[in-house]
Amino acid sequence: MIISFEKLGEKYKIIDLNLNSIKQKIGDSLNIKEIKPTKIICVGLNYIDHAKELNMEIPEYPIIFLKPTSAIIYNEDYIIRPRISKRVDYEVELAIVIGKKCKNIKKDEANDYIMGYTILNDVTARDLQQKDGQWTRAKSFDTFCPIGPRIVKDIDPMNLNIECRVNGEIKQKSNTKNMIFDVYELVEFVASIMTLYPGDIISTGTPPGVGELKAGDVVECEIEGIGILRNYVKDEE
């Protein structure tokens, strides 16, 4: 299906992802459920305004961690609050989708390896994160990685309005220009450590304003030029 996507008078190119050939077709809609990343790399404390909110020093290098691919859900799916957690938070983030295998590349080359950009909600069991002192358990539950609604290529990733709303109320609001490490620096840094494969995701960190999700909530993550990622929240049965 061919679609036309236009917002605020600017036209954007939508990427059609074919995992066999990793083709980029201008104007085709994306079935984001076809993305099969081998890994999801997330970045912590990557917004200047978020660091100020937490009264923390600016990191010298990106702080990275992994989320499992089993946590992925999509637009309009349910986020399930696990029974063992009493506090589950939202975190809206711009996510990079890798288009070509890469290792040890420079930031000036990074754009050649990027398929496009999407939205990721880095859902976190905050109470477990605080108990553990590390992040794996808190960020790895099933349904804790909503992504979507599409992948977009031709936008300026470093000047996008980013926002999270819960039940229509704005909770997070910033711009990607407030990132400490830009998307190209992040690709360079991660690729210096591990090989990146087509479909792999690098999520670029969240702005200030993170907070709790409760059963019955509707959480909407919106990034300029990409769209709205909407999910519903319920408790584990």
From Swiss-Prot:
Listed GO biological process terms: small molecule metabolic process
Q: Which InterPro entries match?
A: FAH, Fumarylacetoacetase-like_C, Fumarylacetoacetase_C_sf
| Origin superkingdom | Archaea
What GO molecular function annotations does the UniProt record carry, in alphabetical order?
catalytic activity; metal ion binding
Q: What are the alphabetically sorted keywords of the record? A: Metal-binding
Name the positions where a divalent metal cation binds: E91, E93, D122
Q: Is Cytoplasm among the key words of this record? A: no
Record flagged with keyword Metal-binding = yes
Pfam families attached to this UniProt entry: FAA_hydrolase
Name the PANTHER family on file.
FUMARYLACETOACETATE HYDROLASE DOMAIN-CONTAINING PROTEIN 2A, FUMARYLACETOACETATE HYDROLASE DOMAIN-CONTAINING PROTEIN 2A-RELATED
The family note in this entry says: Belongs to the FAH family.
State the protein's name: Uncharacterized protein MJ1656
